[in-house]
Amino acid sequence: MTVQTTVPLLDLKMQYETLRHEIEPVIKDICDSQYFILGPKVAEFETEMSASVGTKRALGCASGSDALLLALMALDVKAGDEVICPSYTFFATGGAIRRIGAVPVWADIDPISYNVTSATIA
């Protein structure tokens, strides 16, 4: 007899519970205003984000996949270019690279930081 255990892809319940009191009023404001695309909350987010990271501008995206694609486009990555990326990542990382026609080059990660480092790329 085999017992099958299902591991959820991504469980954000615990994280959501800690942020619920911040998230729900904003969602209500957006629903009440009917500004589902762009609108004042997006402009506010972009202003706060650019100030937070010290840039002139920030751009809110519909998804992390869109953000990765736009970043590659902003860097003028072309079809056939190689892009180094971590081997321990969400599948959208490689997907954005392939979508633009580039080639993902998988690099190992540092076991403590889980990031690509100069040592893991070499």
Can you say where each PLM-predicted feature lies in the sequence?
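PLP-dependent aminotransferase-like
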Residues: 73-122
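Conserved PLP-binding active-site segment in aminotransferase class I/II-type PLP enzymes
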Residues: 1-74, 78, 100
